[in-house]
C-alpha cells in the first residue's frame, strides 16, 4: 500500500504549525485527519487545527504535547511513538515557504493510495519499488502530474472500457418547444 514518506508529513505538519492560518485558506488547501494514515499524525493534525481554531497564531511542539496530554489515548500514542521528538522534528526541519510543494505531493500520494484501496492499478502512475524496471520514469512523470491529471487518466481508462462494452447508448436531442403545438391543440376545446 502506498504511503506518504515521513519527510513530507514533517513538512505538512511543521508548515501548519508555523503558519496555522493556512488551514483557513480552503480555496488552496484542504486538510482533514483522514488525510493522514498514522494515528499519531491524525492526533497531531487535530491538535494543530483545534489550537488554531482556539486562537493560536503559531503553534510549537510544547503546545501540541500539552494539548494531547489531556487525552489518554493520544498521550499513550505520543509516548509509544516518540511523539515529542517527532513534533520537534516538525518544528525544526520544516520550511513553511515550501508548504505548497509538499501539500501537492501529499495530496497526490493520498489520491493514489485511495485509488489503490479501491482496486485501481496505479503502477503506471506511481512506483514505490526502486527496483522496479520503470521506477524512475514513472515517478518522474508523477512529479509533473496534479490530482486532476491523475483523475483524468483514470476517467479516460474507464471511458475506454465504456466505449468497448456499453452498446446502444444514444441521446435523443430536442428543444423545449418540441411538441408544444400538438399540446396546445390537444388542450383547446
Task: Cite the ranges covered by each PLM segment.
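The Walker A/P-loop phosphate-binding site
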Residues: 152-189
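Bacterial replisome coupling helices
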Residues: 7, 65-165
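Generic preference for flexible, low-structure residues
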Residues: 28-29, 52, 118, 122, ...
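Noncatalytic partner-interaction/assembly domains of nucleic-acid and motor enzyme complexes
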Residues: 1-109
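Charged, low-complexity surface segments at secondary-structure and domain boundaries
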Residues: 48-50, 139-140, 166-169
Amino acid at each position: 500500500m502506498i504511503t506518504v514518506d515521513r519527510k513530507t508529513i514533517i513538512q505538512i505538519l511543521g508548515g501548519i504549525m508555523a503558519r496555522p492560518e493556512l488551514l483557513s485558506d480552503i480555496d488552496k488547501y484542504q486538510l482533514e485527519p483522514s488525510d493522514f494514515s498514522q494515528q499519531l499524525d491524525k492526533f497531531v493534525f487535530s491538535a494543530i487545527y483545534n489550537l488554531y481554531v482556539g486562537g493560536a497564531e503559531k503553534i510549537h511542539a510544547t503546545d501540541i504535547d500539552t494539548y494531547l496530554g489531556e487525552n489518554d489515548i493520544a498521550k499513550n500514542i505520543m509516548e509509544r511513538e516518540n511523539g515529542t521528538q517527532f513534533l520537534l522534528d516538525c518544528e525544526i526541519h520544516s520550511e513553511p515557504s515550501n508548504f505548497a510543494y509538499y501539500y501537492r505531493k501529499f495530496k497526490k500520494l493520498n489520491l493514489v493510495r485511495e485509488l489503490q484501496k479501491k482496486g485501481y492499478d496505479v503502477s503506471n502512475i506511481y512506483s514505490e519499488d526502486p527496483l522496479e524496471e520503470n521506477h524512475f520514469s514513472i515517478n518522474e512523470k508523477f512529479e509533473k502530474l496534479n490530482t486532476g491529471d491523475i483523475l483524468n487518466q483514470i476517467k479516460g481508462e474507464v471511458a475506454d472500457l465504456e466505449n468497448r462494452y456499453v452498446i446502444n447508448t444514444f441521446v435523443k436531442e430536442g428543444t423545449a418547444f418540441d411538441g408544444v403545438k400538438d399540446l396546445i391543440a390537444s388542450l383547446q376545446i
